[in-house]
From Swiss-Prot:
NAD(+) binds at residues 273-287. It holds the Pfam family GIDA_C_1st. FAD binds at G13, G14, G15, H16, A17, G18. Transmembrane segments: none annotated. This is tRNA uridine 5-carboxymethylaminomethyl modification enzyme MnmG. One of its GO terms (cellular component) is cytosol. NCBIfam families: mnmG_gidA. One of its GO terms (biological process) is tRNA methylation. Its main location: cytoplasm. Belongs to the MnmG family.
Length: 632
């Protein structure tokens, strides 16, 4: 049957990509439907119960700066918060939160159910209707047809999903959930470039069977950090400890002796697994010289005894899992509540995507999350937000944007998308700060300053968040001005206080603002002396902007040069074979990737600076010819 209501955007999948996609589209005013196989699993954390980490928290903050749900849901569910790399530079500092699975899922569902313009419907999607090269409707398992202007597909690990435990395998999207077989077959019919990837999860353990007394305690940070710019410590539930144990020689022997029973090593699994989150059997094989690996014992929530042993993801048979877990200190009597497993699933070459995450071959069909070859909640969430935003823009008549994708110098989201569509991936892609060439400008602390104004123009940022952002920016400007008006000299009282509190002896007069350039002097020192009571986020921004000013200016110069290439568009139907001087190899690579700008073309492996110059001259010449034709 035809559903009586027509939608602007239909989002398939209620995971981290799907929820952010649906929320973004609805916030922008698009009539949106979130289609999920099970309403009870909306926002479910399928693997580790944690949000954030190196590179990942930067993505979470970007989602938050654009009005998304992930960061606030984390503040409402986080049972341990830590700042990683806290002693390193501002660019690589990262917040990580251990989350209560039940509370996180509840926070996401509450946000979804209270979002205007958003409907939720429980049913698996079996088909996407395509007419004249454009997605027009979604068909459910029972034949309900939802007509729509755009479709966002966020299928996670469900497309053709196969679960492996030892040499036994079964069809599944994750443990306890059916896979999407018909939809996977339909996408293959559409001749989209498909591959197989693999991920996995460890066994879960009953905390009552664990001896924590022999493990190292890993407490959270004090004072507690928050994940969202709108978050507050008062939102946090009860805080708990995590624990650390280790594998040992006996653990490794057990695993090595049973590698022939591993689907990964027997050849049963064809999909490539995540390089930066390998299974324990892969670790033992790849790092044979190591006699021990850290294992983090993480609570799954406040109302459950289940623990997540981070670091022992596995697809080995259950009897082997039991044996190697019992070989570790503190886990000798551990009761396993759920076995670990690997899951193999379809993904589609992201080089077939536009920067908006719309497929090149089918108009108005967008992909986000693991279907694009990424791994991680955060990577999925930020893609969902981008896909949902661009899907909604198709239906918006009054927006100043036709499409929107941030550049590499604007957001880690820009880095992620550019990496995917330019280089593709043959293994699950994970974000790291090292992937960003402008990471000093792309810190987790300034995501709001980079993106919230754009989010407001797009319609993603509501009045409450916008007011908070404006107040923060006014506070930064006001406090900066105040500090520039306060002078410390070697002989005045302020200078003496600075020396007494920090040990820094002044040799000449200096403003309180300029004092922050000194490595040993921090904003909190100056605030204590001068009586400032501004928010800690404001102080942090001022201190970073002062201490890193020289480096930031140099990166900005590099960005200004790159922008000239970013602003030179390459048409999707550009004929590279007519560019005199390009080698056949470069022509083939450019024709395959179809870069949208000269800058993206320059990031394709094998495309030389000389080739970019030839392209630039050809584009310039074509523009002149076109301008002359238009004038005649």
């Amino acid at each position: 049957m035809q559903y009586p209501k027509n939608y602007d955007v239909v989002v398939i999948g209620g995971g981290h990509a799907g929820t952010e996609a649906a929320l973004a589209a609805a916030r922008m005013g698009a009539q949106t439907l979130l289609l999920t196989h099970n309403i009870e699993t909306l926002g479910q954390m399928s693997c580790n119960p944690a949000i954030g980490g190196i590179g990942k928290s930067h993505l979470v903050r970007e989602i938050d700066a654009l009005g998304g749900a992930m960061a606030l849901a984390t503040d409402k569910s986080g049972i341990q918060f830590r700042v990683l790399n806290s002693r390193k530079g501002a660019a690589v500092r990262a917040t990580r939160a251990q989350a209560d699975r039940i509370l996180y899922k509840a926070a996401i569902r509450h946000t979804l159910e209270n979002q205007p313009n958003l409907d939720i419907f429980q049913q698996a999607a079996d088909d996407i209707l395509v007419e004249n090269g454009r997605a027009t409707a979604v068909v459910t398992a029972t034949g309900i047809i939802f007509n729509t202007q755009t479709v966002v597909l966020t299928s996670g690990t469900f497309l053709g999903g196969v679960i492996h435990i030892g040499l036994e395998s079964s069809k599944g999207g994750r443990a306890g959930d059916q896979p999407s077989i018909k939809l996977a077959d339909r996408l293959r019919e559409l001749k989209l470039p498909v591959g197989r990837l693999k991920t996995g999860t460890p066994a879960r353990i009953d905390a009552r069977s664990v001896d924590f007394s022999v493990m190292a305690v890993q407490p959270g940070d004090t004072p507690l950090p928050v994940m969202s710019y709108m978050g507050d410590v008062s939102m946090h539930p009860e805080q708990v400890n995590c624990y650390i144990t280790h594998t040992n020689a006996r653990t490794h022997d057990i695993i090595r002796e049973n590698l022939d029973r591993s689907p990964m090593f027997s050849g049963k699994i064809e999909g490539v697994g995540p390089r930066y989150c390998p299974s324990i059997e892969d670790k033992i094989h790849r790092f044979a010289d190591k006699d021990s690996h850290q294992i983090f014992i993480e609570p799954e929530g406040l109302t459950t005894h289940e623990l997540y042993p981070n670091g022992i993801s596995t697809s080995l048979p259950f009897d082997v899992q039991l044996e190697f877990i019992h070989s570790m200190k503190g886990l000798e009597n551990a009761h396993i509540t759920r076995p670990g497993y690997a899951i193999e699933y379809d993904y589609f070459d992201p080089q077939n995507l536009k920067p908006t995450l719309e497929t090149k071959s089918i108009d108005r069909l967008y992909f986000a999350g693991q279907i694009n070859g990424t791994t991680g909640y955060e990577e999925a969430g930020v893609q969902g937000l981008l896909a949902g935003t661009n899907a909604a823009l198709v239906t918006c008549e009054n927006s100043e944007f036709d499409v929107w994708t941030p550049r590499r110098d604007e957001a880690y989201l820009g880095v992620l998308v550019d990496d995917l569509i330019t280089h593709g991936t043959t293994e699950p892609y994970r974000m790291f700060t090292s992937r960003a060439e402008y990471r000093l400008l792309l810190r987790e602390d300034n995501a709001d300053q980079r993106l919230t104004e754009t989010g407001r123009k797009l319609g993603l940022v509501d009045d409450v968040r916008w007011q908070a952002y404006e107040e923060k920016m006014e506070a930064i400007a006001s406090e900066t001005s105040r500090l520039k008006d306060i002078w410390a000299t070697p002989i005045n009282a302020l200078g003496a206080q600075v020396t007494a509190q920090t040990g820094e002896v002044l040799s000449k007069e200096s403003t309180a603002y300029d004092l922050l350039k000194r490595p040993q002097i921090h904003f909190n020192d100056i605030a204590a002396i001068t009586g400032s009571e501004v928010d800690s986020q404001v102080g942090e921004q001022i201190e970073i902007s002062v201490k890193y000013a020289g480096y930031i200016d140099r990166q900005q110069e590099d960005i200004d040069q790159m922008k000239r290439l970013e602003n030179t568009a390459l048409p999707m139907d550009f004929d590279y074979s007519v560019v005199s001087g390009l080698s056949n190899e470069i022509v083939q690579k450019l024709a395959q990737v179809r870069p949208s700008t000269l800058a993206q073309a320059g990031r394709i492996s094998g495309v030389t600076p000389a080739a970019i110059q030839l392209l630039a001259m050809t584009v310039k010449k074509q523009k002149k010819v076109q301008a002359a034709l238009n004038a005649s």
